[in-house]
């Protein structure tokens, strides 16, 4: 997909749009594309602190928004982390062991899954959209190349939009422009934007160290590394292990 193809799929609107920005690769590149399409004054990003292990991603989200010159709000959602801690490896303090990419291949519900996270985050963002008279909520949800969650599919987004359409006074539509793209295709869009330098302000790792370096072995890292290699560029973020980019 080229940028022009993406822009043609995005709605034309005179209202502001909201981006659900985790600080990860998908939502960050999507936010860059939204700014290029609508302008920095029309895009507002929302990030959620739900007790995720990779809390540094919120810092990365703030850095990216500063570089892009857009509004940014971090919303406290600690109760979700409290609920998910016993069963999700993705929550700080959880005793659930972090799986590797080999552990999750073919698993319909990996241990990194946070129960109903995307439903909750998107519902809150739709509420913010209605309160601020925004027309669209954009999410970087993507069907992963090697594994997937039930709440990252286009079917999931379509179902939420069907519920939201019952709102009698304010119509808000959720859009997931990357839902059918691979991460390699997303990176290609960033290359076309000539903003790969901004990817230093992203974090995909589920288990970064205290210095913010990605582990390089969790499912999210493995997929990110694989797709940067497919795109034939070096990932600018630091890793705890040596990555053979030139092989």
Regions found by a protein language model. Give the residues of each.
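Glycine-rich phosphate/adenylate-binding loop
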Residues: 194-208
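ATP-dependent adenylation/nucleotidyltransferase module used to activate substrates
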Residues: 1-196
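Short microdomains enriched in Cys/His and/or Lys/Arg
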Residues: 230-247
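Glycine-rich nucleotide phosphate-binding loop and flanking beta-alpha elements
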Residues: 145, 228-229
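Local cysteine-cluster metal-coordination motifs and their immediate loop/turn environment
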Residues: 123, 204-226
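Short amphipathic alpha-helical surface patches that serve as generic macromolecular interface elements
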Residues: 157, 186-190, 199-202, 215-218, ...
